[in-house]
């Protein structure tokens, strides 16, 4: 059992016969009245979003989630195909199932696919990926101010804020959990 006060992003639990994963949460402690937890939940099976508030002492049954590493193969524009390395079985996933991770995945990279009762519902990118910059504005010569960032597009199409010294063609390491630049590779 998990209590509402212990909910965090990524937790998966059962509520009213459905399985939800926590997309966002906020613990609210008003000056008057009881504390509560405001959550944004995604239905694991149909992808629907639901915003709900809970009393922090409410308890839920945790859902058993299977995690399997699979290789991202390709997209046909509508579906994204992943392959199990042991059975060579390919599974197609739609954009709603891959949206958080796909902006950091290149073809042939490995990702964690989450399953509930044999049904794939979510993709988790590796914590760190190395991608090449395909477009960014050139940094001004001599501009060495610290913590000044500029937008850069990487080879997967994601936009990441990078320091001024990063140029097109450079490879960088990105933390996929936050979408932030880590270092030049």
From Swiss-Prot:
Source taxon at top rank: Bacteria
SS bond list: none
One Pfam family here: Elong-fact-P_C
Entry GO CC: cytoplasm
Entry-linked InterPro entries: Elong-fact-P_C, NA-bd_OB-fold, Rib_uL2_dom2, Transl_elong_fac_P/YeiP, Transl_elong_KOW-like, Transl_elong_P/YeiP_cen, Transl_elong_P/YeiP_CS, Transl_elongation_fac_P
Single GO biological process annotation from the record: peptide biosynthetic process
Annotated compartments: Cytoplasm
Keywords of the record: Cytoplasm, Elongation factor, Protein biosynthesis
Metabolic or biological pathway, per its Swiss-Prot or TrEMBL entry: Protein biosynthesis; polypeptide chain elongation
Any GO molecular function: translation elongation factor activity
Family assignment from sequence similarity: Belongs to the elongation factor P family.
Function: Involved in peptide bond synthesis. Stimulates efficient translation and peptide-bond synthesis on native or reconstituted 70S ribosomes in vitro. Probably functions indirectly by altering the affinity of the ribosome for aminoacyl-tRNA, thus increasing their reactivity as acceptors for peptidyl transferase.
Name of this protein: Elongation factor P
Organism annotation: Clostridium tetani (strain Massachusetts / E88)
């Amino acid at each position: 059992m998990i209590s509402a006060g212990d909910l965090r992003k990524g937790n998966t639990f059962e509520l009213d016969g459905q399985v939800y994963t926590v997309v966002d949460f906020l613990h609210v402690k008003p000056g008057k009245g009881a504390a509560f937890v405001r959550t944004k939940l995604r239905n694991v099976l149909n992808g629907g979003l639901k915003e709900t508030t809970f009393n922090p002492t409410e308890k839920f049954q945790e859902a058993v989630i299977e995690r399997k590493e699979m290789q991202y193969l390709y997209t046909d524009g509508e579906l994204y195909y992943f392959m199990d390395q042991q059975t060579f079985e390919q599974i197609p996933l739609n954009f709603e199932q891959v949206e958080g991770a796909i902006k950091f995945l290149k073809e042939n990279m490995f990702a964690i696919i989450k399953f509930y009762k044999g049904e794939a519902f979510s993709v988790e990118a590796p914590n760190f990926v190395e991608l090449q910059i395909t477009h960014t504005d050139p940094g001004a010569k001599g501009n060495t101010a610290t913590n000044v960032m500029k937008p850069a597009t990487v080879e997967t199409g994601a936009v990441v804020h990078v320091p001024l010294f990063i140029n097109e063609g450079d490879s960088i390491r990105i933390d996929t959990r936050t979408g932030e630049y880590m270092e030049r590779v």
